[in-house]
């Protein structure tokens, strides 16, 4: 049985989501059309509304519906600290920890020369302007511990060298509750060299 062009378009659209291959996209499309047409319509409306109303915060670059997000407007936040993360999901993870009360800057990515992502694509100029505005005293680089995240952290640290705020990096170490025999060797090596 040949699929309709509309069904193929839906499958292709679903494949744009991270981690969704052809088979998963087909299963989702068939499920929505066969078992949950009302859910499919709600999803379509929610996507349309999000695309129309969600924008980047003028200060920190995260997602918001207002020109400036609620975190940036919160007077209780520690304004001398600025935590740099790759994505809004990373920002949410830091917030869930409950241990950070400063402000954020969301890069919306990381350097990846192989993928054609350079310093202009991650808003480095905007970050530098924010970090050197005289208010920020500590910039905490919380990029991921991947090759791209490390490269991004290095470029940020070099760009800010001697320009104002101190630059710190998240510590690496053995996760709480883990057993050493199951921890990867790189993490053990970093935990030993960065011990306090």
Curated annotation (Swiss-Prot):
One of its GO terms (biological process) is DNA repair. A zinc finger (C4-type) spans 57-72. Residues 80-175 form the Toprim domain. GO terms for molecular function: DNA binding; zinc ion binding. It comes from the Bacteria. The keyword Zinc applies. PANTHER family: RECOMBINATION PROTEIN RECR. HAMAP family: RecR (MF_00017). May play a role in DNA repair. It seems to be involved in an RecBC-independent recombinational process of DNA repair. It may act with RecF and RecO. Belongs to the RecR family. This is Recombination protein RecR. The gene is recR.
